[in-house]
């Protein structure tokens, strides 16, 4: 009986550790190539539990906000409202935290996804 309780407690503790969100709070920078040129980005993230918030600054579209942000372990997702050819669009991001780098996949509209890496900025 005690062995079963101990095993259950261990499994519960391991589950809590695995679900812990990576702390990516702070400034991150990166760039990706588009058909019209290089787009430089600055992301300022805040993490509260599993909720991801913050701001973005694009050399192409200007400032925006992080919306619908979630982070679970090393996996994250969020959306960014933007404009394309004068029309409002929603850019969707998914990503994987890799220490001081995050691999992001960015999609919007009928365009193929952009994959790029951002780096923590000190």
Range-by-range predicted roles:
Residues 1-9:
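Bacterial N-terminal signal peptides that target proteins for export
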Residues 16-21:
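Sec/Tat signal peptide C-region and signal peptidase I cleavage site
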Residues 12-13:
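Repetitive helical segments and hydrophobic/amphipathic motifs
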Residues 22-122:
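Central antiparallel beta-sheet cores of small beta-barrel/beta-sandwich binding domains
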